[in-house]
Curated annotation (Swiss-Prot):
GO terms for biological process: carbohydrate metabolic process; cell wall mannoprotein biosynthetic process; GDP-mannose biosynthetic process; protein glycosylation. The keyword ATP-binding does not apply. CDD domains: cupin_PMI_type_I_N (cd07011). This is Mannose-6-phosphate isomerase.
Length: 459
């Protein structure tokens, strides 16, 4: 008889310099709960950036009780993934689940699509360790700031007209061509106008990124002085989001973190986003972004490929970044994800994936799904709001990883019942019914899972 497919995991934490220090880092807090005292103690002077949950070889999760890696367990028993997923994803978990704790901005970056990833990996495996694409989703668990996708073009045109240092670095000819094209195509949504707009966007952005280090440094000094002296009037009147005062503060803060950097100017090309806990954004492969501050749950296709171009001491690949981007532009609202009630049917998509007991219903507990337009992963957030509240996840034909982010309770699969509290992480095998029961007034978990599109139950 096979063991019950409920496995408590030990998960490693990465200490990148952009992470929050010591116990202020959720990634560190959760790692401390996941690992034994003799294996991990939080150092208050050390930054802790990412907790990794999954089978990726850079930081693989392990069975807490046997020490074997989750990858070994999956490869020994394909039923944990389901035969269809094991075949589709070469006996590996299709997704990588993370907690990020961000004190200092991450690099201006994008993740290559599948075709480009294969090419970059073959050419430069040191800097591009995977041949897979990396679409990703970020769900805030504290106040979050980030840069995501290109702004509406009228906003960029406003900045080129009102931020002399930006116009100087892009160059007068490119800036003028951009502003004139955007004005001429205003309100024109034809394919031809969109293609023309994307072309001038790539031209202006490419010119910025191709400018010399000396020119960028001189322009950065001018930009920082202007931001400091102008305050709320920075960038002129009728300022696009997030407003002159906030943009001035951001320029000062990011300059304090990185000094003169191309990222200070990329700021004016990208949407600035603020999220409260529970809000989410989805980033496709080839979408440009940078996280600035906060704590997030992040889920992505299993890859560690990053093409960077600013706010980083690491390897930069500006040419590839400029050439790979889609140059789609849209308000940030179009990148935010609206979760759906996971206890209800979604027409033509899936049946209800979970049920609540009466105690959970009475306390207005929430079970919602964030379901991006790819099949490698979805994420369900469960917030049980009273002791005795219970959610039962229906069996799905795919694997799940569950992390508790606040409170405590019990997790059970079949006859196996275990304690789960803040920082605990569990793997649940395919086709298993899983029950969470709260022993707290606020018991929150996030569950990442994969089912293939042909199956309607759960995705």
């Amino acid at each position: 008889m096979l063991p019950v497919p409920l496995i408590q995991l030990q998960c490693g934490v990465n200490s990148y310099e952009w992470g929050k220090k010591g116990n202020s880092s959720r990634a560190a807090q959760f790692a401390a709960a996941s690992l034994d005292d003799n294996e991990f103690k939080i150092d208050e002077e050390k930054p802790y950036a990412e907790l990794w949950m999954g089978t990726h070889p850079s930081n693989p999760s392990k069975d807490k009780h046997t020490g074997r890696t989750l990858l070994e367990l999956i490869q020994d028993n394909q039923a944990l993934l389901s035969p269809a997923i094991a075949e589709r994803y070469q006996n590996k978990l299709p997704f990588l689940f993370k907690v990020l704790s961000i004190q200092k901005a991450l690099s201006i970056q994008a993740h290559p699509n599948k075709k480009l990833a294969e090419k970059l990996h073959a050419r430069d495996p040191k800097n591009y360790p995977d041949d897979n694409h990396k679409p990703e989703m970020a769900i805030a668990i504290s106040d979050f700031e980030g840069l995501c996708g290109f702004r509406p073009l009228k906003e960029i045109a406003h900045f080129l007209d009102n931020v002399p240092a930006l116009r100087q670095l892009v160059g007068e000819d490119k800036a003028k061509a951009f502003v004139e094209t955007v004005k001429r195509n205003d309100g024109n949504e034809s394919d031809e106008a969109t293609a023309e707009n994307k072309k001038v966007l790539q031209s202006a952005f490419g010119a910025l990124m191709a400018s010399s280090e000396a020119d960028m440094t001189a322009a950065a000094d001018k930009l920082v002085q202007s931001a400091k002296s102008a305050g709320a009037d920075f960038t002129g009147t009728a300022v696009p989001s997030p407003g002159g005062a906030k943009l001035s503060e951001l320029v000062g803060r990011l300059h304090g973190q990185f000094g003169a950097d191309y990222g200070l100017f990329v700021l004016f090309f990208l949407n600035f986003v603020e999220m409260k806990a529970g809000e989410a954004i989805y980033l496709r492969a080839d979408d440009i972004h940078a996280y600035i501050s906060g704590d997030i749950i992040e889920c992505m296709a299993s890859s560690d490929n990053v093409v960077r171009a600013g706010f980083t001491p690491k390897f930069k690949d500006v040419d590839n970044l400029v050439n790979m981007l889609t140059y789609d532009f849209a308000p940030i609202e179009q990148q935010k994800m609206e979760p759906t009630d996971y206890t209800q049917d979604v027409k033509n998509k899936r049946e209800a994936g979970a049920t609540l007991n009466q105690t959970a219903i009475d306390s207005q507990s929430e079970i919602v799904e964030y379901n991006p337009p790819i099949e490698e992963f979805s994420v369900v957030r469960s917030l049980l709001k009273s002791q005795g509240s219970k959610v039962t996840f229906k069996p799905i034909d795919g694997p799940s990883i569950i992390i508790c982010t606040q409170g405590q309770g019990k997790i059970s699969v079949g006859p196996k019942v275990q304690e789960i509290k803040k920082g605990h992480v569990f793997f649940v095998g395919a086709t298993a019914e899983c029950v969470l029961e709260s022993e707290d007034d606020k018991f929150e978990t996030f569950k990442a899972f994969c089912v293939l599109d042909e199956q309607s139950n759960g995705n």
